[in-house]
């Protein structure tokens, strides 16, 4: 590891680096199948796959930063107390595929408690450790990290659990926000405003790495006010400007493999035809999925 790494926290640890989940055609096909079986849209798959290129693949594991133990294709974390997003993925597999969970984790001494904390059997002492003590044990003993690497490489059920948990924890498009339009509060979903693949991926990047998109309503209100927007249809025309303002790690507006928002109208040319009632909006995002439930990475 570099001596001065932005999130470096521990004098020892593991950094299991592997290619992103969509590097080869076979991996890409498997990832697509996992998202399809989970009932998650192709737009969501493309967004998560783009972020995976910044995070890792299903087997990627590291224990050196403020997430403490970071695992998988979008780097789920334990956090210091052993109750972070990784536990959501473990619970998903344990609930949906108990036999696979027993094979992947329980037989190696890794489990989760009923109140959502990770537990491990210390390979050195045989003691059962819970929460913060379990996290420290994983950081200190690479053999426990190896369990996650092995499951990420060979277990289709663990990969599927990662996909489902990632969507449940990090999908930002169904969140409700309140905007000020013509001086009146208007409640809408994020997907009523951002509908392009590049825009969705930009927001997902923030949600995964920062844990939230709390700046989004302020950005939208500022841009809406600057352009005199009175309806959601007006605001939608400025999606590209909104997405540019929400950029985080990567400028996805330059990604040729993602659908892009339209250029905004020339200043002063906002169509009066757009100023119609948005009740019964038919223009809802194609990425607003049929309702499935849905860092700073201490950071998350």
Model-derived regions: residue spans:
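Cell-wall glycan-active module
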Residues: 1-300
């Amino acid at each position: 590891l570099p001596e001065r790494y932005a999130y470096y926290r521990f004098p020892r640890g593991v950094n299991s680096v592997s290619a992103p989940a969509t590097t080869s055609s076979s991996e890409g096909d498997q990832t697509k199948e996992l998202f399809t079986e989970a009932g998650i849209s192709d737009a969501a798959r493309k967004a998560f796959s783009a972020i995976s290129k910044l995070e890792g693949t299903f087997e990627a594991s590291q224990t050196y930063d403020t997430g403490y133990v970071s695992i998988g294709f979008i780097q789920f974390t334990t956090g210091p107390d052993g109750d972070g997003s990784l536990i959501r993925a473990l619970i998903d597999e344990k609930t949906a595929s108990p036999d696979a969970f027993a094979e992947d984790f329980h037989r190696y001494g890794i489990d989760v408690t009923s109140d959502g904390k990770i537990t491990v059997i210390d390979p050195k002492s045989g003691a059962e450790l819970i929460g913060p003590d379990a996290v420290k044990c994983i950081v200190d003993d690479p053999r426990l990290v190896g369990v996650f690497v092995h499951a990420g490489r060979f277990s289709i059920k663990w990969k599927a659990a990662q996909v489902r948990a990632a969507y449940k924890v990090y999908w930002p498009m169904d969140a409700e926000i309140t905007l000020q339009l013509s001086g009146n509060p208007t409640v809408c979903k994020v997907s009523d405003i951002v509908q392009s693949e590049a825009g969705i991926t930009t927001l997902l990047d923030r949600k995964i790495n920062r844990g939230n998109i709390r700046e989004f309503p302020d950005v939208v209100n500022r841009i809406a006010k600057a352009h005199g927007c009175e309806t959601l249809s007006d605001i939608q025309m400025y999606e590209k400007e909104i997405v540019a303002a929400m950029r985080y790690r990567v400028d996805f507006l330059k990604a040729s493999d993602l659908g892009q928002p339209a250029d905004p109208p020339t200043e002063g040319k906002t169509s009066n035809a757009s100023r119609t009632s948005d009740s019964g909006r038919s223009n809802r995002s194609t990425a607003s999925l049929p309702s499935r439930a849905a860092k700073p990475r201490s950071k998350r």
